[in-house]
Amino acid sequence: MATEVIATEGEAIYAWMIWILPFIAALIIPAVGKFSKISTGRIAVGFAAMSAISAAVLLPMALDGHEIHDQIDWISAIGLKAGVLADPLSIIMANVVGWISFLIMCYSTGYMKGDRDIVRFWFWMMFFIGSMQLIVLSDNLLQLFFGWEGVGLASYALISFWYRDKAKAHVGKEGRSALGIMEYYSPTHSGMKAFIMTKVGDVMMLAGMFMIFAFAGTFGFKELLADTTWAVNMSAESLLVPAAVLLFGGAIGKSAQFPLNEWLLEAMTGPTAVSALIHAATMVKAGVFLVARLGPLFFALGAAGILADQFFEIIAWVGAITALLLATQGMVNPEIKNCLLYTSD
């Protein structure tokens, strides 16, 4: 069980910097790009490295089973605070995201060399990394949702990065179809499809969040866990399971689980570095992280013990169906890049 510790000022700053640094880079890059496009890549790699190092500094704390919980006033009128929750789960995930993202950024300096829109590429890549780290380190559902939407917006911009829709940027084979549906997609089509399909899950997640807030009066993970009266009241009105499933809807969309998995293949229209960032490192892992973050909460609801079984049975069935579908699709897909994609989900 993680133990909350009184963090030193330096430790708390490291926790904040993990997600703030990529956003700072995203703000700087467009201005610098007006004078030197080459420098934008160096800025992106440098800030990605600093974010990853900030996460690594907190690893000893995670290995000791401790955590940092630091808050600042956000919306004082309603008593809402913004905060970071750096516990073993979030610290380990922040390191996974940070270091894989750093390696992808290093690779991108060569892969994207000479691209006419390189400044826009670096901006959205850093915005994406910052949004994902915000998801990982948020101490409440509302703040997490801002990062959630940031990841969705950045993924749309990156999947459709080559928006001029030249033939070489398409995914699939021209003329190939399955069940009468063409399997040849342009970047703009793919980006829009990913954006719309993930928004279905986002709306479900938002509904689940506010259902819980209506009973609990808070979005904070620690506050929800400390006093479970809200869960007893929701369970009495048969609303606890629907709220949990709605929250899981967000994970279904972001992690491309059945039935919202059809955007996944078409997302390969983005640059290879984008595909690596979305599929291998971050975006499809956001749903997994959300379930992991909420897991202890639902296990702790002793007054509604049946819920944990029902909730996790639904997760297991959705995951099993998705794995079967994507495995069979991967077996018959002629493109090696797409076969690798199906193994990432």
Language model region names:
Residues 1-16, 27-123, 218-234, 293-295, ...:
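Transmembrane helix-loop-helix hairpins at membrane boundaries of multipass inner-membrane proteins
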Residues 103-120, 124-144, 153-344:
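Hydrophobic transmembrane alpha-helices and their helix-loop junctions in integral membrane proteins
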